[in-house]
Amino acid sequence: MKTLYSLRRFYHVETPFNSNVGIAGRDIESTGFAWWSGNSRLINVSGKLLGAHVAHAGLMVFWCGAMTLFEVAHYIPEKPLYEQGLILLPHLATLGWGVGPGGEIIDVYPYFVVGVLHLISSAVLGFGGVYHSLIGPDTLEESFPAFGYDWRDKNKITTILGIHLVILGFGALLLVIKAIYVGGLYDTWAPGGGDVRIIDNPTLNPAVIFGYVLKSPWGGDGWIVSVNNMEDVVGGHIWIGFTCIAGGFWHILTKPFAWARRAYVWSGEAYLSYSLVAVSLMAFIASQYAWYNNTVYPSEFYGPTGPEASQSQAFTFLVRDQRLGASVSSAQGPTGLGKYLMRSPSGEIILGGETQRFWDLRAPWIEPLRGPNGLDLNKIKNDIQPWQERRAAEYMTHAPLGSLNSVGGVATEINSVNYVSPRSWLTTSHFFLGFAFYIGHLWHAGRARAAAAGFEKGINRENEPVLTLRPID
C-alpha cells in the first residue's frame, strides 16, 4: 500500500504495547499513531475510514431515534413541552407534525414514526459501518476508484467537497418542500396564537435574504438570528439550497485555483480542522438562535426567551391591576417611571417599570396590541384576549433565567418543579460544544500546518503519561 504520509514526522516514536498484537495498517509501527488516536490510524486505509464514518453516522441516527422514542414515552399531554425537559419533540412540532392551533400537541404518533424510522436507518448504517470496518477492502482506490482518494489530490478533495455541498443543498430544500407542499410548518405568528400553515409565498428577494447576513451581530440588529417571519426562513432555505447545489457542482467540475492550492494545507488533518471550525461556527449560531429567536424556536415549544418572560411579567400585572380599576396609562411606580406604561428611548409606548431593558421585544402574544407608536392604549384597555393573558402568565413563571428572587423583572421565580428551560439546555450545550470544537480546530490546524512545514514530530512518548499505566495486554 502506498504510504501517503512521511513517517519522519512521527519519530522518535515508541510504543508501550506488545507489538505482536498489532494489526498491519492499524498499529503504531505502520501508522505512527497509538491505539487511542482513533481514526488517525486509518489515514491511509480509506475503506476502514469509510467504515468508521458510516458507523459514526449510525450512532448519531440511533441517538436521534432512541431519544425521540424516550421523549414520546415520557410525554405528558397536560404539560407544555418546555416544562418536560424535551428537546427533540419541540423540533418535530416546529416542523408541523402532530400540532394544532396555539401549539397544542394533538397527536404524538408522528413522533413515534420518526423515532422508529431513525432506529431502522441506524441499523442499516450500523451494518454498513461494521461491514466496512471488518470485512470490506482496506482501501477503496483499487476496488472502487470512484470512491478512493489521495489526501494530496487537490482536485479529488474538492470534488468530495462538492458532493457534500450538493447533499447539504438538497437537505435545505427538503425543508422548503415540507413548508410549501407537505403540510406546512408551525408559525408562531399566525393569528390567534400560532398554527400550522402552508408557507406559499416565501421571500425570494436577495436584498431581503442577504440583508440579514449584512446586519450587525451586535446590539438590536441580530445578524441572521433576527429573522422574524416564516416567509424569510423558507426563502433563506431556498437560497441556501440552490447556492449549495450550484457551489457543489462548481467544485465537482472545476479544479482549485492556484491561489487556493497555495493558501490551504492539503492533508487529512487539515481537512479535519476545517470541518471542526465549520461545525463550531454552526454550533455558536445555533446557540444564539435557541436563546434569542422565537420564530424558528417558537416559545410554545421551547419556553419564553428571557425578554419574553420579563415583558410577560409586566403585562400580567398590567392586566390584573387594570381589572382592579388601576389607570394603567398614568400610574407611576416608586422610581417615578410609569408603573405600567412608559416611553421608550425612541418615543414608543412600552411596558413600564424595570422591563424597559427589553422594550424592543417582539413576540406574537403582544404584537396585536401595538399601534404606529408602540403599544396602543385603546387596544390595551379593550382588546386584550384571553389567550394572550394565559400565555403571558405561563411565560412569566417559566423564565429561562429563573431565579428565586426576581431582580428588576429580568426573571421571575421559576414556579415549576425541576424546571430548566430547553432554551437554557440548547444554548449552553451548543455554545460549549462549539467552543470545544473550536479548540479542536486550533489543535489540528496547528499540527497540520507544522507537518506541512516539516517540523511536526508528534508527541515524544518517552514522557507520555500512558507509560505509567498497566499494559492492556
Swiss-Prot record:
Q: What SUPFAM superfamilies does UniProt report for this protein, alphabetically?
A: Photosystem II antenna protein-like
Topology in the lipid bilayer: Multi-pass membrane protein
Which residues participate in [CaMn4O5] cluster binding?
E367
Q: Name one GO molecular function term.
A: metal ion binding
Propeptide residue ranges? Answer: 1-14
- Alphabetic keyword roster: Acetylation, Chlorophyll, Chloroplast, Chromophore, Manganese, Membrane, Metal-binding, Phosphoprotein, Photosynthesis, Photosystem II, Plastid, Thylakoid, Transmembrane, Transmembrane helix
Q: Which InterPro entries match?
A: PS_antenna-like, PS_II_antenna-like_sf, PSII_PsbC, PSII_PsbC_sf
What this chain does, per the entry, is described as: One of the components of the core complex of photosystem II (PSII). It binds chlorophyll and helps catalyze the primary light-induced photochemical processes of PSII. PSII is a light-driven water:plastoquinone oxidoreductase, using light energy to abstract electrons from H(2)O, generating O(2) and a proton gradient subsequently used for ATP formation.
HAMAP family reported in the protein's UniProt record: PSII_PsbC_CP43
Spell out the protein name for this chain. Answer: Photosystem II CP43 reaction center protein
Annotated source species: Guillardia theta (Cryptophyte)
